Amino acid sequence: MEAQQFIKAPGITTAIEQAALAAANSALANAVVVRPFLSRVQTEILINLMQPRQLVFRPEVLWNHPIQRVIHNELEQYCRARAGRCLEVGAHPRSINDNPNVLHRCFLRPVGRDVQRWYSAPTRGPAANCRRSALRGLPPVDRTYCFDGFSRCAFAAETGVALYSLHDLWPADVAEAMARHGMTRLYAALHLPPEVLLPPGTYHTTSYLLIHDGDRAVVTYEGDTSAGYNHDVSILRAWIRTTKIVGDHPLVIERVRAIGCHFVLLLTAAPEPSPMPYVPYPRSTEVYVRSIFGPGGSPSLFPSACSTKSTFHAVPVHIWDRLMLFGATLDDQAFCCSRLMTYLRGISYKVTVGALVANEGWNASEDALTAVITAAYLTICHQRYLRTQAISKGMRRLEVEHAQKFITRLYSWLFEKSGRDYIPGRQLQFYAQCRRWLSAGFHLDPRVLVFDESVPCRCRTFLKKVAGKFCCFMRWLGQECTCFLEPAEGLVGDYGHDNEAYEGSEVDPAEPAHLDVSGTYAVHGRQLEALYRALNVPHDIAARASRLTATVELTASPDRLECRTVLGNKTFRTTVVDGAHLEANGPEQYVLSFDASRQSMGAGSHSLTYELTPAGLQVRISSNGLDCTATFPPGGAPSAAPGEVAAFCSALYRYNRFTQRHSLTGGLWLHPEGLLGIFPPFSPGHIWESANPFCGEGTLYTRTWSTSGFSSDFSPPEAAAPVLAAAPGLPHPTPPVSDIWVLPPPSEESQVDAASVPPAPEPAGLPSSIVLTLPPPLPPVRKPPTPPPSRTRRLLYTYPDGAKVYAGSLFESDCNWLVNASNPGHRPGGGLCHAFYQRFPEAFYPTEFIMREGLAAYTLTPRPIIHAVAPDYRVEQNPKRLEAAYRETCSRRGTAAYPLLGSGIYQVPVSLSFDAWERNHRPGDELYLTEPAAAWFEANKPAQPALTITEDTARTANLALEIDAATDVGRACAGCTISPGIVHYQFTAGVPGSGKSRSIQQGDVDVVVVPTRELRNSWRRRGFAAFTPHTAARVTIGRRVVIDEAPSLPPHLLLLHMQRASSVHLLGDPNQIPAIDFEHAGLVPAIRPELAPTSWWHVTHRCPADVCELIRGAYPKIQTTSRVLRSLFWNEPAIGQKLVFTQAAKAANPGAITVHEAQGATFTETTIIATADARGLIQSSRAHAIVALTRHTEKCVILDAPGLLREVGISDVIVNNFFLAGGEVGHHRPSVIPRGNPDQNLGTLQAFPPSCQISAYHQLAEELGHRPAPVAAVLPPCPELEQGLLYMPQELTVSDSVLVFELTDIVHCRMAAPSQRKAVLSTLVGRYGRRTKLYEAAHSDVRESLARFIPTIGPVQATTCELYELVEAMVEKGQDGSAVLELDLCNRDVSRITFFQKDCNKFTTGETIAHGKVGQGISAWSKTFCALFGPWFRAIEKEILALLPPNIFYGDAYEESVFAAAVSGAGSCMVFENDFSEFDSTQNNFSLGLECVVMEECGMPQWLIRLYHLVRSAWILQAPKESLKGFWKKHSGEPGTLLWNTVWNMAIIAHCYEFRDFRVAAFKGDDSVVLCSDYRQSRNAAALIAGCGLKLKVDYRPIGLYAGVVVAPGLGTLPDVVRFAGRLSEKNWGPGPERAEQLRLAVCDFLRGLTNVAQVCVDVVSRVYGVSPGLVHNLIGMLQTIADGKAHFTETIKPVLDLTNSIIQRVE
């Protein structure tokens, strides 16, 4: 637990300390983890190098080069994070398996040290293939790697990574290689020590030792145990100095990261490299001091150490700076060489004072000390000489200047003016020196080095020019020139959709800066005449519009355009935003798609783009396939005559209305600014600004679509034309190619009016969540598609050309293209089209469409998608159009995944669409079917599926055969090969023990191939010629072959036998153990075929009933003929055949076989032994557990000491605990109460039409006095902790706001914040931390009173019936037995009580904010205790129900109609209600004792009663970050909460009150109601109420409330409409559509109870709450609206009101 008891952190006194603490926490959270073991010196070096990064040392590994590798890993992480999917140059073998994001790796053939690296490379995964090719000299097995080197490889990739692999390549060579790869960015990590800039020698620094021999540089870091870096000095110098490459392949080189002398260089291809000077070593800790004489000695017979001595020595910066400061400031008399030597000796000692380093010191050699003293002395002497000379010469100059006369000064003033470029002292030049003089200096400081050198690339520019003139004579002859002098050119690949080597950039392309288009523009109608023709506007309207002009004021803001159009004396406003709904004159819906960045918008078959040009705003419009371009000049237009404007508007309105009444589909409603605006024909958010708001002329421009305005008389186009011509005021229609009344048919997946077409079936291949129609939200945010965790598709059939038929979701496909079932306008529709729009909204940009042929539209944004258009068979059956729909999708390269086009709302028969796909697809394509279509296909599919062996599969399988042939086991496979081709097969799949093997007859087969020797012997005993896979390679040629357990055979051997046999019949179970890659070479998964079962057998003759239930998740349709009910037993002596999971367990258990070897075998009795080494196998492979559990027919003993099978839900703990608690095998009556739906005999609900949701809730707020709350929740002050011990976290951070998706902003429930930490504390303390009032008294009196309701209970026995009901309830909740543990009370998990805050609040007619009540919580007992006590409590509850009088109703255990009849029969009674306050909190030792008394009556075991008393009397509630240790109380999550709360409620009512004319009583938890004529408090009530601290609130009235219903004597029970509607207002209907659908179904269930009593409910419920009947009437109508799926939701973000200033604690 993160909290400490009663700990208060010391306050932070200053803001500086708070900022420092936050900075320290942030540094630690982002620290670099150092894993190797380091010495003290290595640790100090690493800390200094990695500054300012924080380091965290967690030593766990030993490395040869710890310092370099830590730096390498840090820079590698940076490079890979920036590069994304990339090409890698010279990858280290150990990093191959850890980085699957690499597209291709370039290697060189290993020599020297690289051979050792390859030998130690991983032997599994992708690295195994690379390792095999490197060490054996084999060619690569795939395109993920090569051994051509970076310079000779031509794999196309946009981004590259080179980690310490470019030290042998010049920068110019790298530029040429990048161009060869088509690469634009390369992240290169290089080690560039500054010592390579110095002469040869040996250089000691604080971090490393560098030996420079003139040609090579060898670097070894502190503590290295093997050789270090060895690189060419000249290449390193080039990398240090070069910042750009010029020539044919220009580059810029930028240093983006540096740790010491380790750099990350970003090489970027740039057309014109600019100067990029940089300082490579600004944090260098050494200066290099030159030795004047250098190394001495001469070559001799014996090698001398002098030849390796350096001419420069690395001196710490602090030593040199302090020495120079000391010497330069000495007095002339005190300056001498001996004093300098004394000072240098002093500062070279390291001095520490405690943990503080006072002087860092310097451990130098004799040569270095001598060189430093010499250089320092001579340098200081030179500086002193300059000082002396400067002072003396300066004094003489001053004397001369001040001695000048007036004439000389006047001459200087006239002819020596300074000007702007005057710098004081610049004219003085007393001293000049040469570079080779001693006075030029003796040391080099890397901190001031600046480099900016450009290097030309090595392309043969001159030779290329010569070749262009003299070497291409063949071109003149018409032949192709293959001139060898041509340079390497960068690759320009395909756009990317069919080029496997192409990888797009992860960096968003730079978007062009768009000019602000705001301004005033003049629109002339004659500019848009081409648009009017495209829109099929009648001639007279087009003529009127051409004569008019309009002035448009455009205001642009991010993602929004506002237009104010002035047309004569009328003004219109429109607002362009993405997702705006456009008004239509038909049932078709139009949603505007607007992209401000692209400056485009579109809806339906209309789209436009706009651009600001010098001439004005240029708009390109595409409408119904025709294009129009107009340029609107800036400024205002002449005002049009009001009469002409009015005539134009009236004619346009009549045209829209006529189209609305007579067109089949309609189109856009054309407003005046839609024809005379700058964005025609769009007018989103149309508003007409009129001086008179009641002017009827407004109806000409503003309308709302309704079905009442749509004529149901749909006449054909031929009949519509005469009507149009005869309409008054309308012109004759124009004769365009496509008549305006016959618009394109609606989208295949769109919603269709229910009156015009029958309801369509659910669109094909979609889950229900996709088909949900939601209110139009903002356009969905584009998120990168995440692959599903596991595929659910099911292979149904494979064609000879490789095409496959699946049942499942189209989006699980790996094909290059996805085919969308679109509409002629390619607009976002419903169903599958809507699913495409949700995932890929960019795919519907009309500007990105590529029209190949017909109606199909191809798009590559954001991935390759084909929008295919099938015919609408509701309008016309057109088989040719259906064929063309599929044919138009074949103009592509690559494979495509199809749905069944047209089989959804367009109602094309499945068979026709399937046949069309079968005739018009390409090899390798995939077809995805819905479950109904899959059922049709299963009944009509071809007899035998086909398996296609491609060239790649054959090549990989032959490689596996070669590897097998080299082993002793696989000698029989020598010379065997697999060739590409097609294999037909029959595959019988079935559940374990279904008799697949027994169904094979000897006359039907020649050879049987089995995976194991055990199976081979079993088949041979039956008389079959059976062989293992390797041996069978000699006998399967041309034979009839049966392959048993086919999925477990090595796939290359499976393909070999299938191809060689004359006929092949496969047997197996796809859910059992597949083929295992024992070699870890990666070949098995690469060639594993997808086998489609031709038949499934679901009846097992082997598995007992309990095993079938365990494996039903894998086999939903499994049935058994076995009569054995229970066969699994735990921890009994081993019997029968022993089954283990690993080879180690097999060696430890003589006679055992592994599960893999037992696959396909049958035993009478088995023993499963699970050992600890099989944990990973069992958790990762469900197939191993299935095989182990399905080998026996009678009995299986499970020995699971480590608990491995229990972790995956295979345990008998529930059964053991049941029998331990005294349960017996037996039968009781089921606890399920039969319920039925009310018949519609009156149907009064039909008289309540759907009503407005907003008005209903507003009326409810007015009646109850509730108002919109400014806050989302209230955190009430935390009460004082009166008893117990509270553990709480130190930080009580809370969120400031809550996001809610609700029906209304007026909430009618007590507001709380369930997810807040302070709310959890308040609930814990307020509900369970109050002091319990103990009551010591005998229970006999209360039990005697309780006998009025519950007579004395006889012995009760918990049976397996209750156990079954308990398990059934757990399964319905999605639980398994893994959470039920063995009854070990020392284990905290057995008795843990988990607390969590409830998210639902209580409906109230009072105050919703200032109620001062704490929240509600659930304290859930452990599953172990629930399973232990649950069967007993269920049995006791059944016995109580059997003893109850008929007029006493308990909980929910009754039929509602019976309770209603009992209430209606008590017409002369009043309703007695009792409401408890703090019902759970006031339960104490007395209520617990009464529960134990009842348990004893029932014969429950004493140890179980005492355990229950112990758990209830002292407990710990465990919240996520808090816990409370307390006593007594009642927990809402106990297994018997409802039972014992109801019993305690009955006992209190029976003991405290006496009733006259008692008729009916109902009890449920703390809620109760009694129908009687009068009542009084009994004489014994005061003692019980005072002793237990009960808080009773009695209400006695004619009509009452109980458990969500209204109790009306004489009428019956009625649904509580007000309470239900109030609770709905508090629900969060988001964030997804699933939650909204659940609540909608709950509303439908509630309305079902109102079927016959709606009118009575209005009168009665209004009297209970004191509200008007009209409110209840409106609430019922509002519920009808919600049930119809037409609810309106509001998304609100409200603050949380925090009233908890402090948590009050009581210190014991």
UniProtKB/Swiss-Prot annotation:
Region (Methyltransferase) residue spans: 60-240
Limits of the Macro domain: 790-936
Domain (+)RNA virus helicase C-terminal: 1098-1231
Keyword terms: ATP-binding, Disulfide bond, Helicase, Host cytoplasm, Hydrolase, Magnesium, Metal-binding, Methyltransferase, Nucleotide-binding, Nucleotidyltransferase, Protease, RNA-binding, RNA-directed RNA polymerase, Thiol protease, Transferase, Viral RNA replication, Zinc
Disulfide bonds, paired cysteine numbers: 434-481
Activation and inhibition: Putative protease: Inhibited by chymostatin.
Function: Methyltransferase: Displays a capping enzyme activity. This function is necessary since all viral RNAs are synthesized in the cytoplasm, and host capping enzymes are restricted to the nucleus. The enzymatic reaction involves a covalent link between 7-methyl-GMP and the methyltransferase, whereas eukaryotic capping enzymes form a covalent complex only with GMP. Methyltransferase catalyzes transfer of a methyl group from S-adenosylmethionine to GTP and GDP to yield m(7)GTP or m(7)GDP. GDP is a better substrate than GTP. Y-domain: Indispensable for virus replication.
Protein's UniProt name: Non-structural polyprotein pORF1
Organism: Hepatitis E virus genotype 3 (isolate Swine/United States/swUS1) (HEV-3)
